[in-house]
Amino acid sequence: MAVPKRKMSRANTRARRSQWKATAPTLVKSVENGRVSYRLPHQAELKTDAAGTPLFLEYKGRKVADA
């Protein structure tokens, strides 16, 4: 296992750490029953009725599972 030869300064440590960035997920807009919702792409979407009761999961326009 690699071991640092010298202690890394606080400035260098913080400069290195500043490169760690979280990226915001890309969302897909979908409209269902007049409501706009955003979801992750390439994942099954939960379809609900007007009252909000979950009915089934849909992917690429096909029913893939019951809720």
From Swiss-Prot:
Residue spans of biased composition, Basic residues class: 1-19
Residues covered by region (Disordered): 1-21
Any GO BP: translation
Record keyword Ribosomal protein present: yes
UniProt-recorded name of the protein: Large ribosomal subunit protein bL32
UniProt superkingdom: Bacteria
InterPro entries found in the cross-reference section: Ribosomal_bL32, Ribosomal_zn-bd
Keywords: Ribonucleoprotein, Ribosomal protein
Molecular function terms, GO-annotated: structural constituent of ribosome
Taxonomic placement: Bacteria, Bacillati, Actinomycetota, Actinomycetes, Micrococcales
Family to which this protein belongs: Belongs to the bacterial ribosomal protein bL32 family.
GO cellular component term, pick one: large ribosomal subunit
Gene name tied to this protein: rpmF
